[in-house]
Amino acid sequence: MSGIDFKQKISVQRPFGKPSSAEDEYEITRVFESDRGRIVNSAAIRRLQQKTQVFPLERNAAVRSRLTHSLEVQQVGRYIAKEILNRFKQDKKISAYGLDKLLDPFESIVEMACLMHDIGNPPFGHFGESAINNWFTKQMDPNGGGAEPRGKDQCLVNTLKLREGETELNILRSKIRQDLSHFEGNAQAIRLVYSLLKLNLTYAQVGCILKYTKPAYWSGDIPTSHNYLMKKPGFYLAEEEYVKDLRRELNMGEFNRFPLTYIMEAADDISYCIADLEDAVEKNIFSVEQLYDHMVQEWGETTHGDLFDKVVGGAFRQLGRGQGRRSSEDQFFMYLRVNTVGKLVPHAAQRFIENLPAVFSGSFNQALLEDSSPACKLLQIFKKVAVKHVFNYPEVEQLELQGYRVISGLLDIYSPLLAMPQTAFTQLVAEDSHREYPIETRLFHKLSTKHRLAYAESTERLRHLSPEQHEIYEYYYRARLIQDYISGMTDLYAYDEYRRLMAAE
């Protein structure tokens, strides 16, 4: 397979500071060890311990948080990476693929991407995400955009309303209305590491968490060749120039992926499907015996020695055999995890290698664990059981509805900051106070320093723009400021903050 050279992809360069001159193996490894240190010690990773996996506001430490889930994904990602590299070694392809000095970085990039993959998720998971998008959609009317007004503009933000004869400005307004109405955890992760936390990670490390390749402002048809890669927003307008630099540095086509991202995605798929079921048993939603019946029902007719019998049946037959050493539930899930990982990891590695040219270029338009194989069927039945019997459980649904209300309520509470005239908000930022806006001043004081600094830095770069463009972009970064602050909260902090500000305690 000529043309595959991982030296073109695993770049040691960073967006800030002088270019790296690392050439020997240990120098290159040190670059990515620095990435590891920056990531592991970041506040975003620590906050994962109080963010929802499936069960919001969970007090039982045995039930997974985003952090414990991410640690499990990290381990599976490392395993897949090692499996791929071992097969390259067996086929004597290490040198041919430019990996002589990159074996440790290959693994490290995957591991750290797995650890980071959920850092952009807001409180209360997908329901928090939906709350942000629905709130901003009502404000923005993103589908009413265009180059010229068409009838009554339903946008509630005067700065972003379309105006006759302002074609270029209307295109910008429409783009920003789309962008702000499409908050997405993966795009927020890119924003976190680059704009908010300023971790200055290598382009390769950040490229590995660019899971989807569509900008959040996208409003046109999606090319069929990239309909999977572009099914969700992957980055915001605010980070567009950075993503362009990243693509140049990593030799990525416009809507293509970084090759190691496929491994991170497969590790997540393998990990969460088992974890959600184990947590459901821990929460007494169903017993192991009931879970087994649910899985048999989804699989259909089983035969002795088929994949279901080996993986799920094999685990079920271990029930009770470990008594005195561990509980029957622990026994079952230990074997289920071992059996599942033992089958799906080699399958993911094989799919990576079989499709290497497309994977390397980043144009492979599906997940590694998305084919007609029994391994993928097994993964799908795990997911179906979770959807049918876990996600719609009354306790889960009630907590998700509470989470939706909390995030929507916080956006309502902080919305006066978005309603301020540009000049007044600029004065508030500069002076940390505004006598005519006492409520807004107090709300502004509650915003975190790093988010306020990111806003100030972004608006500082707008000086060269026309007054009309400046006003539009200023509102954009102000809305981003509110999204950044609320999405960065933990579940418990968001819940407590909402109760405090609603005078409910």
Swiss-Prot record:
Write the record's keywords in alphabetical order, separated by commas.
Answer: Hydrolase, Magnesium
- Needed cofactors: Mg(2+)
Q: EC number(s) of the enzyme?
A: 3.1.5.1
**A single Pfam family, by name?**
HD_assoc
Quaternary structure, per UniProt, is:
Homotetramer.
Q: PANTHER family annotated for this entry? A: DEOXYGUANOSINETRIPHOSPHATE TRIPHOSPHOHYDROLASE, DEOXYNUCLEOSIDE TRIPHOSPHATE TRIPHOSPHOHYDROLASE
Q: What is this protein called?
A: Deoxyguanosinetriphosphate triphosphohydrolase
Give the organism, scientific name: Yersinia enterocolitica serotype O:8 / biotype 1B (strain NCTC 13174 / 8081)
**What lineage does the source organism belong to?**
Bacteria, Pseudomonadati, Pseudomonadota, Gammaproteobacteria, Enterobacterales
Name the encoding gene, please.
Answer: dgt
